[in-house]
Regions:
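Iron-sulfur-associated redox domains of electron-transfer enzymes in respiratory
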Residues: 1-179
Length: 179
């Protein structure tokens, strides 16, 4: 037992063995690597996770991905801003297929509480994946960042907090190609 981390069986370093996933993802691609494994080994039908909103890349949305391409192609890496990954949780349960959930520790706690009232949670949500969370920054921090480059949110085509390196740098690209 550790006063900060609580109870644990072991503590290990881990990362994706897929070099492309490891490079493009955050945190060494661990959660994407595990999610891909669960999909490709047919342990689950889909992954419920958070990704960048394709229309507003600074914003996040919850997404259901059925394969590797959908998972990593949707800017599925660290999202350091407001996100509601549980907003599709009941929709995921209603699909009546085994799935995995990737979210923050507080989201996992909410799912555990829901499982006490809805037996489908433990029957269908087979894996709950999370990493350490230090909370999230206010959205205004991201807005201040892009404004320091004289870019407005509606000009963005890509807004990446991390990835493309470990941990990778913050990256923006505008619709007219400015980086």
């Amino acid at each position: 037992h550790n006063l900060v981390w609580g109870y644990y069986l072991s503590l290990c370093y881990a990362w994706s063995t897929d070099e492309k996933v490891r490079f493009e993802s955050s945190t060494g691609g661990l959660l994407n690597g595990l999610s891909i494994y669960l999909l490709e080994s047919k342990k689950v039908k889909f992954i419920l996770h958070t990704a960048a909103d394709p229309k507003k890349p600074m914003r996040s949305l919850s997404k259901i991905s059925y394969n590797k391409e959908e998972l990593v192609g949707g800017e599925s890496r660290s999202r350091y801003g407001p996100a509601a990954p549980l907003d599709k949780f009941h929709e995921a349960l209603d699909l009546n297929q085994p799935f995995a959930f990737v979210g923050k520790p507080c989201d996992i706690s909410a799912i555990r509480q829901l499982s006490k009232a809805d037996k489908r949670v433990n029957q269908l949500c087979k894996y709950l994946l999370t990493l350490v969370c230090g909370g999230f920054a206010e959205f205004t921090k991201a807005q201040d960042f892009i404004e320091s480059f004289k870019v407005k949110e509606d000009e963005l085509s890509i807004f990446r907090y991390r990835g493309f390196g470990n941990p990778g740098r913050m990256y923006i690209k505008t619709q007219d190609g400015r980086e």
